[in-house]
Amino acid sequence: MRRGAPQDQELVGPGPPGRGSRGAPPPLGPVVPVLVFPPDLVFRADQRSGPRQLLTLYNPTGTALRFRVLCTAPAKYTVFDAEGYVKPQSCIDIVIRHVAPIPSHYDVQDRFRIELSEEGAEGRVVGRKDITSILRAPAYPLELQGQPDPAPRPGPPAGTPPPTARHFQEHPRQQLATSSFLLFLLTGIVSVAFLLLPLPDELGSQLPQVLHVSLGQKLVAAYVLGLLTMVFLRT
């Protein structure tokens, strides 16, 4: 088939020879709208179950109609239920399968024709509609399809910084912990020293008067020492 010129090809389908071919006269009498969905057929060459489409044909009238599916390239397609009847105010699904999904057929436009006629062997055609069909190439090369994806390498947990950043973060934390420990230790030593110093009115002390502490200072030192003890016990 020549690309882009499906109108130059003869429509072939079931039925007597010559019926529904190129140059067929328009339907006589009342015209029935041919309602189909989708309006165009797009096949994908990489469909897992094979390139196929479901065409739904509606009959909006109050009488049963005979339908027939014609195609410009019948060798490339298989049409299930290419001819039959549609009940009044009902619909029927027609499965169309592309049987030649080869690279030379990619982006080649074909044409289907849906004809509706009255019941009976010689029923006159009351409506027809042409729809285009095209085969799209696979989204990925065929040689890459079917191959399992390589197993992803296990990475660090979410929220975990890279090793370099983590290395720089651990050092400040260690330094902060060391500084806090030294501060607590120094505060504890000072508190113990305050508790060991004599009161101002204590007799027999050989320390100078400046090293005598009040009872309030001893209470504060005891309170601070108790807090430090609780911190050490929790850690």
Swiss-Prot record:
The keyword Hydrolase does not apply. The chain crosses the membrane at residues 180-200, 213-233. Its main location: membrane. GO terms for cellular component: cytoplasm; membrane. GO terms for biological process: heart development. Residues 1-25, 143-171 are annotated as: Disordered. InterPro entries: Ig-like_fold, MOSPD1/3, MSP_dom, PapD-like_sf. Residues 149-164 have a biased composition (Pro residues). It is a multi-pass membrane protein. Keywords: Membrane, Transmembrane, Transmembrane helix. This is Motile sperm domain-containing protein 3. The gene is MOSPD3.
